[in-house]
Amino acid sequence: MRMFAATLLGAALMFVSSSPARADGDAIAGKAAFEAQCSVCHTAVAGKNGFGPSLAGVVGRKSGTLAGYSYSQAMANAGLTWDAKNLDEFIASSANKVPGTAMQVAVADPEARANVIAYLGTLGTAPAVPAADTSTAAQAPLEPSTQGPSADELLHAGTDTQGWLYASKDYTGQRYVDLAQITPANAGQLRAQCIYRSNNAGATQTSPLVYQGTMYLTIDKAIVAIDATTCRERWTYNWDAKGAVLSATNRGVALAQGRVLRGTADGYLIAVDMAKGNLLWSRKIADAKDSQYLSMPPLVVGDLVIYGPAGADWGAKNWIGAFKLASGEPVWRFNLVPDANEPGADSWTNPSARDHGGGSLWTPLALDAAKGVLYVPVGNPAPDFYREVRPGSNLYTDSVVALEVKTGKLLWYKQFRANDMHDWDLSQVSPLINATIAGKSRELLTVSGKDGLLRMMDRATQDVLYEIPITTRTNVDAEPSIDGQHICPGLLGGMEWNGPAYSPAAKTLYVGTVDWCGTFTKTAEPPAYAQNAHYYGGAVTPDPRAQARGWLYAIDPATGKQRWRQPWPTPLVAGITASKGGVLFTGDLDNNFLAIDANTGRTLYRFNTGGSVGGGVLSYAIKGKQYVAATSGVVSGFFGGTGTSAVVVFALP
C-alpha cells in the first residue's frame, strides 16, 4: 500500500545493510516500538485489519493467507512462512525479501527487529472468515437467510442517511446525502479509516452499495461484502464463468429482500444471499455468441429486477428486460433495436443492419416511482464508425426511452443522435429534479452523454429546455474518413459511466466530465460482422493520454447557467456525491480521493489512494458518524490507471 507514509516499524528508516536479529529480543520494548510506529497501519487484534493486515498470530503463518485481508500480488505469491528468520529478513529490507511488495520497510538495527519479533510472538491468532459457497449449480431458487432492503426502503433510499442502495444512490439518481458532519470548515481533517484491497488488476468501475453497516461491491468475477467502517471482509462469492467472455468490466450490484444481484461477464444474472454469500439462483440471459455481456448495475423495483446487456461495439442487438426477483424468471422484454414487426424498425432502411445494430446498456437507469416510468439511456449503433451500412435514424440508439416499468410498454422516446457515426453513447438519464422555472413547477430529466452535451428535459412534455456543452466540442459534424478526422470529443469524451449529482439544498447540479479528443478513421470497405470480434468499421486514435483533461461544473438546473467551473488535470469519470454539509466527494485519475467545496469548487482535501479513482464514491452514516468511501484501481485499458481494485473509507477523527 504505497500511499501510506508509515508502515511496519516506519518506512523512513532506510539503510543499506543490516545484521541478523538477536535471538533474545525484548517483547516489552517491541510492544512499545509496535505501538509507536507499526500501529499506524497494523493492529495487534485478531480479526481486525488496518491499512495493513492484523499481525496477531503472524509468527508461523503463511504469507499472504490471512482471511479477510487482500494482499498485493507479490505478497500473495511469496510462499513464505513467517518464522523469526523470515520476519527478520523482511523487516530488514522488505524490497529485497519480497520484490514488488507494497510494504516499504528497512530497519538496520538488529536489536530493534528482534524486539518487535519477540512481541509479535506473544500475540494470538486471527479468526478465519467463513468461506462462501461458490457453487454455481443451484437447481431451484433458494430463499435468502435474511430480509431487506424492502421495497419501501428502496423507494425512500434518497432520504436514507445510513445506506447507499443504488449505484446512483436512489431511483432519481441525485447522488445526494442529507449529512452535514463533514463541512468545508473541517473537510481538511478527513482521515483514511481503512482500506480493502484485492489482487485484481482489472478494471475497477464498480459502484459499492451500503446496507445496515455492510458494503457490497463487485470485483472482476466476485461479489464482496465488507464492513463499511473497518473494511473487514465478511464474505466473497466467486462466479466461475461457464462460457466465453467479451469484457469483464462490471459496475456494481443491486440489493433487495435479502439478495445481492449482479450480471456476469458470460451473460448470467445471479442472486447471492446477503448474509452468507451463497448462490440463490442464476439465469442465463445473454450470450457472447450474440456479442453480448453484462456490465450495468441492476435496478430492483418491487419484485422485478431490471437489466440488459452491453456489446454494441461487437455487434450485439440489445434489449432491456425485467426478471422476477425470487427466481430470475423473465417477465418482459423491450428491444432497443426493434424486430421487423415492431415500431421503429423502419428507422433501419437496411433491415439486415438491425441484426447487429447495437444499443448497449452500461450505465444506471432512473425511475419516477410515483408514475411508474423507467428511463433508459441507450448507447451507440453498430458498426460504430461506418454508418453507410445502417442508413436511417437507427432507433432506439442514442435515445432516452421511457417505459412503463411493470410491463415494459413504450411510453415515449427522444433520440439525440440519429445515425450516430462517432460512438457517442447517450450515457446518463439522471438526476431527476423538480424545479420551478419562470414560476412554473417542472419535473426535469437530466440527459448527458459522450457527445459532451448536457440537456435538461421536461419529463411531462419531453421538451428540451436547454442544451449546453460540458467539454470541448470541435469538428463535431465531420465524418470519420480513411485519412482521419480530428474531432472533439473523441471516443472517450463527455460523460461516461457515472452521472451528475444534484443538491436540493443548494439547488445545484454538479457535473464531472472528460475532455479528450481523437482522430476518427473508417475502413475503406464496409465491415463484415464476425462473432466475438469488434464491429467498428473504423477506429479512433485518442490524443496522447497526457493531453486528456477534465472539467468539474456547478450548474443551475433551471437555466443551465454555470455557477462555477474548474478545469482538471485528468479526466473525471468517478462518481460525485453532493452533501448537505456543502462538500462534494469525488476522485480523479491521478489516484486522488477529493473533497471539494460545493460553493466554490475549491479542493479542501485530497488523499492518494494508490490507484486511479474511477468507480463509485459514496457517503453514509453509521452510529452517528459520517463516512465516505471511494473505489480505486485500474480504470480501463483506455483510461489506464494504477493499483489493484480497492475501497478506501474516510471519516473525521
Outline where the language-model segments fall.
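C-terminal segment of classical bacterial N-terminal signal peptides
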Residues: 12-22
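Beta-propeller blade signature
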Residues: 272, 276-277, 318-330, 393-409, ...
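C-terminal capping alpha-helices of c-type cytochrome domains
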Residues: 81-133, 274
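Repeat-blade elements of multi-bladed beta-propeller folds
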Residues: 164-168, 202-221, 245-268, 293-317, ...
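N-terminal cofactor/phosphate-binding cores enriched in small/glycine residues
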Residues: 180-285, 579
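Sequence/structural segment immediately N-terminal to covalent heme-attachment motifs in c-type
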Residues: 24-48, 55-59
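Detector for the c-type heme attachment site
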Residues: 42-48, 60-61, 92, 121, ...
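Aromatic (tryptophan-biased) beta-strands that constitute blades/sheets of beta-rich domains
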Residues: 138-198, 232-241, 278-287, 329-337, ...
